């Protein structure tokens, strides 16, 4: 436990056994809160930090987006891929005065840190797990900006820009109605309480995950590592791939996918009926693929009606046909929902 998780527990949050999730109410109430403005402790995410004069060069040579051109007040979606172009990690990367930091799924953080450390060699960069000193808070909804101001943040003027207040509270604008706060652990509780006092409802992990699903912003977790090329997760559509930078692990596959042939899989937003037993990595089936998997669920979140919404990587032909089932060829049938952006 940390000062941050202790504060959440005293506020009435129920923490998961591994302290990687939190809830403030039952699943239905939490899902309903996502229709308003919410403040969420992002315990399912963790922060890594890269510090040193070679931070930009080091990361630029390893990830899918352009780190060298990331401004001091910038943030970007990014990914680290296997040599076969499959995503090992997806994350939000931002600049810091002495290097960079990134937020990724906590369940892959230790292994990912070890993997990255293998590439350091003579680079003047130090990698560290920053979870002990940095807490992440998500704000989403129509009054998210007001909640961020209430928490003591300075508002960025554009999407994927960031500001830092005097108390060290970093505010990254993901969209006009969606912000990520990175706060020192010692003051995160006060920032969270202030955001709630400014009109946000304290909500749990599932509420944020539902908001991310509705925003079409996927997250690689342990269950989906090395399953997808970046474009299958719509990563170039949300600004997570730069096709003009130099080489990085998997770059040839990512580029070939972009410029040669037709992309056969995309990420879709889907609805699952109540009672469906499924999670990240669950296989999807469609008549045009028979007993063979036609896709996988990526992220899943409960909804207020007892069902679920999810992001799913799916064969485009199967999505167009419209008959896709979860977990087995005769499993529950899912339905397609709109994404907030077009699938190019």
Give the positions of each predicted feature:
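Short amphipathic beta-strand starts and helix->beta connectors
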Residues: 26-35, 78-90, 120-123, 160-169, ...
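Glycine-rich, small/acidic residue-mixed loop/short-helix segments
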Residues: 4-8, 233-241, 255-344
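Acidic, low-complexity central loop/insert segments
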Residues: 38-39, 46-47, 92-215
């Amino acid at each position: 436990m940390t000062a941050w998780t202790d504060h959440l527990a005293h506020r009435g949050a129920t923490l998961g056994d591994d302290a990687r999730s939190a809830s403030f109410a039952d699943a239905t109430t939490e899902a309903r809160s996502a229709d308003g403005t919410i403040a969420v402790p992002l315990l399912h995410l963790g922060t890594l930090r890269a510090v040193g004069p070679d931070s930009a060069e080091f990361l630029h040579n390893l990830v899918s987006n352009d780190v060298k051109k990331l401004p001091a007040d910038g943030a970007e979606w990014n990914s680290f891929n296997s040599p076969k172009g499959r995503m090992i990690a997806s994350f939000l990367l931002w600049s810091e005065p002495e290097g960079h930091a990134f937020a990724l799924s906590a369940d892959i953080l230790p292994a990912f840190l070890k993997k990255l450390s293998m590439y350091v060699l003579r680079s003047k960069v130090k990698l560290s797990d920053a979870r002990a000193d940095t807490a992440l808070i998500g704000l989403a909804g129509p009054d998210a900006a007001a909640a961020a101001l209430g928490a003591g943040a300075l508002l960025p003027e554009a999407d994927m820009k960031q500001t830092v207040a005097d108390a060290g509270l970093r505010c990254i604008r993901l969209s006009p109605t969606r912000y990520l706060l990175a706060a020192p652990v010692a003051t995160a509780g006060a920032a969270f309480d202030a955001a709630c006092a400014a009109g946000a409802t304290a909500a749990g992990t599932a509420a944020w995950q539902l908001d991310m699903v509705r925003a079409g912003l996927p997250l690689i977790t342990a269950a989906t590592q090395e399953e997808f090329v970046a474009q299958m997760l719509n990563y170039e559509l949300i600004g997570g791939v730069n096709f003009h930078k130099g080489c990085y692990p998997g770059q040839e596959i990512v580029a070939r996918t972009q410029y040669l042939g037709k992309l056969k899989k995309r990420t879709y937003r889907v609805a699952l009926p109540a009672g469906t037993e499924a999670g990240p990595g669950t296989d999807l089936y469609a008549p045009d693929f028979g007993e063979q998997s036609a896709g996988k669920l990526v992220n899943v979140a409960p909804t207020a009606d007892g069902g679920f919404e999810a992001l799913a990587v799916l064969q485009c032909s199967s999505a167009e046909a419209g008959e896709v089932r979860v977990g087995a060829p005769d499993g529950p049938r899912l339905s397609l929902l709109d994404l907030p952006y077009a699938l190019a």
